[in-house]
Amino acid sequence: MINEVVIATRKNSRDNKAPIGVYFKDKKVIMHLFFGSHTYDNLLTEDYFSVNVVPPIEIAKAVLDDEDDYLYYNNIPYLKSSYYAIFYKVVKREFVDRNDKFGKSRLMIIEGEEINRVYLNNIPKPYNRADGLLVEMAVIYSRLANKNIKIDENDKKEMTNDIKKYFSIIKKVGGREHKQLAETMLRNLNLL
């Protein structure tokens, strides 16, 4: 099962966050990082990162920029907005070329071993349908915005239609922040 989280890394005193789908297995985590992302670049050489379990809206925010209220555990950044954060040491890196419906891409598969975790005192909010749609928009946005991923024109059109459809629903069921985040993604992709 793929779990959507926010990964936080640090390189040269600069913090980075990104929404990533990860696989949890016992005390390990496995994630696939696309070439060209800051997280890929950071974890090419850095050995520590955090996995942040956050509200869905924070996953969508993470696709747009690295600004956040960071806390630190042994110089590993994690998000103040997390329900909890798990800290990992990279134990394996594998590089593969992938060709799927999203196009051709270079992946780095990271395996991390858990070294610690912290639970924050953040209270969950009720789930809104716009939360899930924003996460789906963020996944599509991250693929369309990454210039290193070559996407077939038909798939690109389908993804563009999906992101517009999700936005139309968010406008009906989401709050102000949901709508603003969705509009920013569409604007950045020149779809609005």
Where is each model-derived feature located?
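N-terminal structural module
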Residues: 1-48, 52-59
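Hydrophobic residues positioned within well-ordered beta-strands of beta-sheet architectures
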Residues: 5, 18, 86-88, 108-110
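Intrinsic-disorder/low-complexity, polar/charged segments enriched in Ser/Thr/Lys/Arg/Asp/Glu/Gln
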Residues: 28-30, 48, 83-85, 107-109
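Ordered, amphipathic secondary-structure segments that act as subunit-interaction surfaces
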Residues: 46-97
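Exposed beta-sheet edge/beta-hairpin loop segments within beta-rich domains
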Residues: 76-80, 96-102, 168-173, 177
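Flexible glycine-rich active-site/ligand-binding loops centered on an Asp-His dyad
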Residues: 93-151
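Eukaryotic intrinsically disordered, low-complexity regulatory regions
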Residues: 129, 135-179
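C-terminal non-catalytic accessory extensions
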Residues: 174-192
